[in-house]
């Protein structure tokens, strides 16, 4: 099963995160399938590859809670079909 989750990058006290599609059993810094976005909580910047995100969501990938909040703020779920909105 796939998840869309945050992968920590950056240095000490200056964390930035990549939003990646990754297997559920992999570690946080494990090998990802594809990078689909970027999130900087300090500068409050977000970059999302919406086409890749929609592809993985339609394939059954589940976003984590934090990633789901980021997607809601960006309006990614407005582009999904209504029957695709079931997340755990």
UniProtKB/Swiss-Prot annotation:
One of its GO terms (biological process) is mitochondrial translation. Signal peptide: none annotated. One of its GO terms (molecular function) is structural constituent of ribosome. Transmembrane segments: none annotated. GO terms for cellular component: chloroplast; mitochondrion; small ribosomal subunit. It comes from the Eukaryota. Keywords: Chloroplast, Plastid, Ribonucleoprotein, Ribosomal protein. SUPFAM superfamilies: Ribosomal protein S16 (SSF54565). It is found in: Plastid, Chloroplast. The keyword Chloroplast applies. Belongs to the bacterial ribosomal protein bS16 family. This is Small ribosomal subunit protein bS16c. It comes from Coffea arabica (Arabian coffee). The gene is rps16.
